[in-house]
């Protein structure tokens, strides 16, 4: 019979006498055991800007929050940094106003207020951090303080948006179609509105209006867009559009303000075919307009800034900015921006910042 004790079965034979490591390079009689030494080394956990730049946010004081992640090997983890606008082109670990190392990836960062940052982690948690306080430290007011956290989503948060009309209210969504509306006005984060099955397909987009906290819009991969009413006692939504032909597959959403594009009754949806669709919430179940932005790649993100609509694509990564009021005339185009484009933000009326993998940050000047 075979020996019952694993220590006898798997122990190193007495006859195993390999030569020194330097002589093992061309030796075929003994296995190279250098991998054991490699696995025994401690991982380098020192703070650093990782290669994958995944999310960026900016507040009204032009202070940037940047999430970078290590996505190699078995252990994925990330770091969060804060920089002033004047530091944008020479970012480093030492020059950061604040930094935070996380055990998991930092997927999304969004400013709720100028000194209040929402952070979505890869382990499904949503955290709220205070980033600036002269009361806690008058000499170094930039310091992180955890205000609250919650694990209200069964899968990692993929969508996070703050209501401009009330920055202390935000909505989060995950790919499994779970939605949460958060009240940040108290001493902790409180979910005031929750839906566990907002869509029958994968949730891919979420957008909030500029002048209201009563509603928001979501879209999914199956070509469905829904308008949600937060005032209802139970989760309540209206179907804005449902693709009966099952041809459309939405990827992103943006909601214009009253002074932007065609007014605050219009919602813009990107799809996997590189097209941007316009929906009028006053005329549900009908697309008001469809424009092709990319002949290759899908629309990964839509950002509105005054009369301009910026569309970002992946596969390949590209950026296009159109003047919607001039018939969607393209006024700026940039090809092969990153190996993978992950996030973007407008810093002023004519400057768009994109981040991603490969080429980490690109500044787009719109003339």
From Swiss-Prot:
Its main location: cytoplasm. It is found in: Cytoplasm. The keyword Cell membrane does not apply. It comes from Drosophila melanogaster (Fruit fly). One of its GO terms (biological process) is embryonic pattern specification. Interacts with csul and tud. The keyword Repeat applies. This is Protein valois. One of its GO terms (cellular component) is methylosome. WD repeats lie at residues 101-139, 152-192, 198-238. Involved in specific localization of cytoplasmic proteins during the formation of pole plasm. Required for synthesis and/or stability of oskar protein (osk) and localization of tudor (tud) in both the nuage and posterior pole of the oocyte. Required for normal posterior localization of osk in later stages of oogenesis and for posterior localization of the vasa (vas) protein during the entire process of pole plasm assembly. May act by regulating the complex that contains the arginine N-methyltransferase csul. Keywords: Cytoplasm, Developmental protein, Differentiation, Oogenesis, Repeat, WD repeat. It comes from the Eukaryota. The gene is vls.
């Amino acid at each position: 019979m075979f020996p019952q004790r694993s220590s006898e079965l798997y122990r190193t034979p007495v006859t195993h006498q390999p030569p020194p490591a330097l002589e093992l390079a061309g030796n075929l009689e003994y296995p190279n055991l250098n991998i054991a030494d490699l696995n025994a080394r401690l991982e380098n956990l020192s703070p650093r800007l990782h290669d994958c730049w995944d999310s960026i946010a900016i507040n009204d004081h032009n202070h940037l929050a940047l999430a970078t992640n290590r996505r190699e090997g078995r252990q994925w983890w990330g770091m969060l940094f804060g920089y002033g606008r004047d530091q944008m082109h020479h970012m480093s670990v030492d020059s950061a106003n604040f930094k935070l190392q996380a055990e998991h990836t930092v997927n999304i960062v969004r400013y709720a207020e100028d000194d209040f940052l929402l952070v979505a982690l890869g382990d499904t948690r949503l955290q709220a951090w205070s980033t600036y306080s002269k009361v806690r430290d008058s000499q170094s007011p930039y310091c992180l303080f955890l205000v609250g956290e919650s694990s209200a989503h069964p899968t990692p948060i993929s969508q996070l948006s703050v209501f401009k009309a009330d920055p202390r209210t935000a909505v989060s969504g995950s790919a499994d179609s779970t939605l949460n509306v958060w009240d940040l006005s108290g001493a902790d984060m409180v979910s005031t509105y929750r839906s566990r099955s907002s869509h029958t397909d994968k949730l891919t987009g979420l957008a909030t209006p500029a002048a209201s906290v009563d509603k928001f819009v979501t879209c999914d991969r199956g070509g469905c867009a829904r308008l949600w009413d937060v005032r209802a006692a139970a989760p309540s939504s209206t179907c804005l559009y449902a693709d009966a032909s099952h041809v459309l597959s939405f990827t992103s959403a943006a909601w214009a303000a009253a002074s932007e594009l065609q007014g605050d009754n219009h919602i813009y949806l990107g799809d996997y075919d590189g097209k941007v669709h316009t929906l009028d919430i006053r005329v549900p179940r009908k697309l008001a307009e469809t424009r092709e932005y990319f002949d290759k790649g899908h629309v990964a993100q839509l950002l509105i800034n005054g009369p301009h609509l910026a569309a970002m694509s992946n596969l390949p990564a590209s950026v296009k900015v159109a003047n919607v009021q001039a018939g969607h005339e393209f006024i700026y185009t940039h090809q092969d921006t990153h190996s993978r484009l992950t996030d973007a933000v407008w810093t002023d009326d004519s400057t768009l910042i994109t981040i991603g993998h490969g080429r980490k940050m690109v500044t787009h000047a719109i003339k």
